[in-house]
Amino acid sequence: MADEVPTAVPLATPAGSSSLSFTQGFLLGQLSIAILIFCFIKFFIFGEPPSADDRALHLNSLRRARTLAHQQSYKQLRTRANSTSLSLRHKPSTSIIRKGEETRGGPSIATILAKTYYNVKGHQPESLDWFNVLIAQTIAQLRADARQDDAILTSLTEVLNTGSKPDWIGEIKVTEIALGDEFPIFSNCRVMPAEDGFWYGPGSTGNDKERLQARMDVDLSDVITIGVETTLNLNWPKPMSAVLPVALAVSIVRFSGTLAMSFIPSSSPPSTTAPMPSPTSNTHRSSSPSRPASSSGAPPHRPTTLAFTFLDDYRLDLSVRSLVGSRSRLQDVPKIAQLIESRVHAWFDERAVEPRFQQIVLPSLWPRKHNTRGGAPEDTEAAAEGEEGLDEDDFAVVDGNGTAPGSTSYIPSPIAENVTLEERIEAEGAKMREAEIRAGVRKPSASQERSRGRDDRADGMRWRGALPR
């Protein structure tokens, strides 16, 4: 009888082992996720931020690298512009003003420094104590005006809520404003030639003449605070699914840096020889509003401006307080402080840190009669009455027949519209002379005395101040 081959009997595995391995894997996965979340919260959100010195050093290195890159690109652009403009020659303009020694639009830097007895290399920096006093008075007045009412709170709230704002940010409300009590201190002022690329506006190739700049150190240690409240809205799966209240308070505790200022002179488009107008064109111009005579292709007029910027080695220390949540609140989250601080530095770098600069158009400093103050009250009233409406705008554009086109702020009297400018000036001069005679500053002429006497006899009254006849 043949031997029977034994068949392998499968080992019976307990059912609990498979469920145990699944449970172990599930718990291990949950534990790993919990560890990752814990590490993220501990080291990313609540991690200790770097010190203020380390942050300032890192930001200064980044800004310096950006400035050096801009200077290199500017030098290349200026080299190409000089090579292409060698063949261009400006035509000499005819002027009735006698030219001085410098025939290229003004004295050079060396001439200015020599005539003002200023040695750039040997002159000691100035303290600017007088300038600090003037700036402190101005800032104190601005703070006093802002504390009178809540207008600054209302205006800041409107500014923060207008414009493009993400839909996940609720209404922003300004809750706190502290304007500080200290004043900036300017010191160590020195004058030097302006560096290339810092003082040329858009569209300029840098062919302009060199300019001087004044550099001064600025230091402000104060607490200037703005506090806001808003909400973070979760709009998924439906709008306003969850709302997270957030309160922030950002304070500037210190600012130090170097301020550079320079004057940018005005530039006018080159004058072109205009053809003689025909009678028909004069008639058409008198019936239509005046337009600038320059063509559209001519460069625009650039007024005199004051440009200022801060060097890239400035330091801005901020203090950010945060409060997130309604019941279980998170207070002073370091990551929120870092994000806000980086945004503030980026906003300031894009506007007032080299190579970018701010320009302020300077007003006209020519003495004007209607800007005169002081003296006797009668003189002030007479000057105000005589100069009412006679502004620079009245003489800016004049038609060919001598009349000012359009409507101005000056309304002389309900007389004919074709009164010439000379007649208007003569009438205003008569008003001023009459006011001076009434105030006793000026004696009347013989013709005025005779006409005054006839008026007195006709009315049966004597002119006040005149001698009895």
Curated annotation (Swiss-Prot):
Recorded domain comment: The SMP-LTD domain is a barrel-like domain that can bind various types of glycerophospholipids in its interior and mediate their transfer between two adjacent bilayers.
Main location: endoplasmic reticulum
Biased composition (Low complexity): 266-299
Pfam family, one: MMM1
Oligomer and partners: Homodimer. Component of the ER-mitochondria encounter structure (ERMES) or MDM complex, composed of mmm1, MDM10, MDM12 and MDM34. A mmm1 homodimer associates with one molecule of MDM12 on each side in a pairwise head-to-tail manner, and the SMP-LTD domains of mmm1 and MDM12 generate a continuous hydrophobic tunnel for phospholipid trafficking.
Source species of the chain: Pyrenophora tritici-repentis (strain Pt-1C-BFP) (Wheat tan spot fungus)
Membrane-side (Cytoplasmic) residue stretches: 47-469
Coiled coil (residue ranges): none
Keywords: Endoplasmic reticulum, Lipid transport, Lipid-binding, Membrane, Transmembrane, Transmembrane helix, Transport
Annotated GO CC locations: endoplasmic reticulum membrane; ERMES complex
Domain of life: Eukaryota
Described function: Component of the ERMES/MDM complex, which serves as a molecular tether to connect the endoplasmic reticulum (ER) and mitochondria. Components of this complex are involved in the control of mitochondrial shape and protein biogenesis, and function in nonvesicular lipid trafficking between the ER and mitochondria. The MDM12-mmm1 subcomplex functions in the major beta-barrel assembly pathway that is responsible for biogenesis of all outer membrane beta-barrel proteins, and acts in a late step after the SAM complex.
Name of the molecule in the record: Maintenance of mitochondrial morphology protein 1
Family the UniProt entry places it in: Belongs to the MMM1 family.
Lumenal side: 1-25
Positions of the SMP-LTD domain: 124-363
InterPro entries: Mmm1 (IPR027537), MMM1_dom (IPR019411), SMP_LBD (IPR031468)
This protein's encoding gene: mmm1
Region (Disordered) location: 266-304, 426-469
